Amino acid sequence: MINKRKAIIYIGFGELYVVMALLSIKTLRKIDKETKVYLITNINFDPINIEYWNKDRDKILYFPDESNNNREYKTSLNKYIDEEKVVFFDCDTLILSKFDIAWSYLDYFDIALKMNPVKQKKIGKGDVSILNNKYLIRDIPHFNSGVIFFKKSDLIDEFFKLWNQFYKKNNIKYDQVGLMESLFLSKLRILPLTEEWNFFPDINFFKGKVKKPIILHYTNRISYVIENELLKIARLTKLDLCEIKNKINKKRSERKLKIGRLEWFKLRLIWKFLYKTEQKRLNLS
């Protein structure tokens, strides 16, 4: 039975993000086979060959817009869903464990998202001032917007209105800066989630030395297991394999630049030699 009070939403602008979203949904359906999924996208594709996409339940919201406008939709999520309880997952996530308890959190809180365990140092995020220029993002505890549980209400509508306004006002490509200010100025009851709810894997995760999280957020850590799954989906949906491979390589280059050539070499070795182990851990075997 479809639960009409709950929904899960993704925003996939660009072909790579569409296949990432569909891979995330593949892992989701091993945990939750019933909750309705919305996919907001600017790619006109046919999911007919995706066996875990239920056309009678799930819904694609197609907007022929530029890919760089994706955050305009993210900061206005509440406009696209009627369900009472909602979770937004970034496309580059894998759902590895049950998350049912989070729905009940929304009986007591208006919004739940991960509190970042370290300072935000990234240029364009951490060095931006908020709250009447009183604080820099790097000087204040902050949240990550990759996984957001929220409950529909007038308060949440006001929060999204603020978030969208701050995003436009800041005129930067990151939505996280506006997220901070809108959260702090809102009257929402905010539940900070722990790291397992939105986990960024390091080399120890791929070595199998880290407990499996609830939600894995791999960003540019696109292993060979993940890459092969993405390419399978690209073939099923008849999307542009060349473009998707190029985008994957670009993201990997970003990871290599961040961690250095030696650590990148180690990571690739682990991806190669622990391929089957990783498949099992990611529920993709």
Task: Say what each PLM segment does.
Residues 1-285:
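Glycosyltransferase catalytic domains, chiefly GT-A lineage
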